[in-house]
């Protein structure tokens, strides 16, 4: 019995690491690794993609990709074998979620139809004007307009619209080109108008608006005027 006890003790002293020194492996999540490797990169979310080892990084108005294994960032679009731009689809989905929460009370309201149409527009944008002609002929929508001026001239026209005593009529005049060709505009000194424009620009930045027109209709985003697709959606 003593001999057996001595043998066991010898084994414990000879191989202590196998019994007491079990190594603990720390697993670092992709999120933690990204924050450590790229501390200056702000983001809203990091989520896995359908590609193993590749994660989508959403900044709030842009999407790029991160590979934790190689600790690198990739810029560009993911395209499926069917030619579908996966990156664009994801971006539109995230944009739709944000547009659904827009404060419509700060927008210019036109019409009283049952279907809500939200638009970011520039009054000098050709396709914005084409869209206005399309929507102004319908009685089944309510249009909520957020302004996104792409030039000083557009900004002046927007202020003229918001300063007007008859906002709807002035908006109609602008969209029908009656104030084009550098037509003189009355001065607008209303500070509330300036604040409204700043609010619209801030909201556009948060959503990721880069061009006009941009529409939100029945949960879908259209980054351009697509009359056939919009017509079909409104009929559904």
Identify the function of each model-found stretch.
Residues 1-8:
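Bacterial N-terminal signal peptides that target proteins for export
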Residues 8-16:
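Bacterial N-terminal signal peptides
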Residues 165-172:
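Conserved, helical-rich catalytic subdomain that frames metal- and/or nucleotide-binding sites
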Residues 160-164:
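Short, hinge-like loop/turn segments at secondary-structure boundaries
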Residues 5, 19-159, 173-176, 184-212, ...:
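Extracytoplasmic thiol/disulfide redox context detector
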Residues 179:
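Extended basic-aromatic, gly/pro-enriched interface segments that bind polyanionic ligands
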């Amino acid at each position: 019995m003593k001999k057996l006890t001595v043998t066991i003790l010898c084994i414990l002293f000879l191989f202590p690491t196998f019994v007491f020194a079990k190594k603990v492996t720390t697993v670092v999540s992709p999120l933690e690794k990204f924050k450590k490797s790229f501390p200056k990169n702000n983001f809203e979310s990091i989520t896995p993609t359908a590609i193993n080892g590749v994660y989508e990084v959403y900044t709030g108005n842009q999407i790029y990709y991160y590979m934790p294994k190689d600790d690198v960032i990739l810029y560009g679009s993911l395209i499926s074998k069917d030619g579908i731009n996966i990156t664009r689809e994801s971006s539109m989905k995230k944009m739709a979620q944000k547009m659904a929460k827009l404060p419509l009370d700060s927008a210019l309201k036109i019409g009283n139809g049952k279907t809500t149409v939200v638009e970011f527009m520039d009054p000098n944008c050709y396709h914005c004007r084409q869209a206005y002609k399309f929507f102004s002929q319908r009685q089944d929508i309510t249009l909520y307009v957020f302004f996104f001026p792409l030039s000083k001239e557009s900004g002046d026209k927007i202020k003229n619209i918001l300063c007007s005593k008859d906002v709807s009529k002035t908006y109609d005049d602008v969209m029908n080109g009656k104030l084009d060709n550098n037509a003189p505009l009355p001065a607008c000194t209303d500070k509330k108008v300036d604040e409204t424009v700043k609010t619209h620009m801030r909201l556009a930045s948060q959503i990721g608006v880069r061009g006009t027109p941009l529409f939100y209709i029945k949960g879908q985003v259209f980054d351009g005027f697509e009359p056939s697709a919009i017509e079909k959606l409104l009929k559904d």
